[in-house]
Amino acid sequence: MIMNDTTKVYNFSAGPAMIPREVLCQVKRELYNWKNLKKSIMEISHRSQEFISVVQEIKHNLRKLLHIPNSYKIVFCHGGARGQFSAIPMNFSKNANHSSHNNVVDYINSGYWSYSAALEAKKYCYTNILNVCKTNNKKQYILPMNTWEINDNSLYLHYCPNETIDGIAIHEEPKFNDKKIVIGDFSSTILSKRINLERYSFIYASSQKNIGPSGITLIIMHESLLQNINSYVPSILNYKILVNSNSMFNTPNTFSLYLSGLILKWIKKIGGIKEIEKRNIIKSNMLYNMIDSTDFYINDVVSNNRSRMNVPFTIINTKLHEIFVKEAYKYGLHALKGHNLKGGIRASIYNAMPIKGVLKLINFMKIFEKKYG
């Protein structure tokens, strides 16, 4: 049994993901007495000036980190990304028969999550699903954006730039005409790299990967979209209501917002999104180089479409997968089991995963191959 170097634990979970240690230490210090108020942040009213200032600071830091133009609204809500799978078509479809051909939306299918969003949209719209993930020589790849057969009259286009299960990424940014409403599910890539928000009309992200703990959903949307929100949308999902109430239509997850605010400060402290992106490129390149250096480990995505956040791989002898996960756990490398739909092994290396955590995984992979290869 491999038992070396177990003093430090690294969490490779796809979500809830690892949180920076120094942020957790700050939470520990403040848990019982936040800002000398003699009570926890969890006990503070969401309508108090103290908590409103927390949310205002979060929005300010998001605007600075992501260079969000003033014409975009920032909203926090409930329900995760799956909640948005329903909310988006409900808010933006035409108030007509869902199968009507003047109620068309484009959904780019690149994997499980984008397809799940498309299936939900079919309940409300005529959904044009474009399959852009292909396979050649047992390697998955994404068709270039300029080959996507987009409907010129579609109400919007939805896509997911990073599929966490298969580890497939669309690194291109949208280059469609200015009138096209582009919606992106950034749940697993938000804050991990620089993006040109002006190429999107609406992006959203669940919080439990790069933003903070689970429990909130971030929406960044152009203010022009608020002009045509359907009135029949339930209030808790209605974007106009959420914007006008400053994300306080009902009680938000105050603790998750507080902790997310600390993580944004941590990102600023270490150098912002530019530094985060640099680290993420280093981490993912190191891990993929390890996989490609041997026939023992296999990744089935072409290099141009490999995810920087989620690195799935298999072992040439698939019977070793369970052994790998168990021995890695004893080595201090947790949550490496692949998704149930794909199997194998998956290392999710979000923002909070330090380079030394990936180095420790690589060292374990070398030891494991030497033992079982």
UniProtKB/Swiss-Prot annotation:
Database matches in InterPro entries: Aminotrans_V_dom (IPR000192), Pser_aminoTfrase (IPR022278), PyrdxlP-dep_Trfase (IPR015424), PyrdxlP-dep_Trfase_major (IPR015421), PyrdxlP-dep_Trfase_small (IPR015422)
Main location: cytoplasm
Pathway: Amino-acid biosynthesis; L-serine biosynthesis; L-serine from 3-phospho-D-glycerate: step 2/3; Cofactor biosynthesis; pyridoxine 5'-phosphate biosynthesis; pyridoxine 5'-phosphate from D-erythrose 4-phosphate: step 3/5
UniProt binding sites for L-glutamate: 47
Cofactor(s) annotated in UniProt: pyridoxal 5'-phosphate
Keywords from the named record: Amino-acid biosynthesis, Aminotransferase, Cytoplasm, Pyridoxal phosphate, Pyridoxine biosynthesis, Serine biosynthesis, Transferase
Assembly description: Homodimer.
Name listed for the protein in its UniProt record: Phosphoserine aminotransferase
Gene label: serC
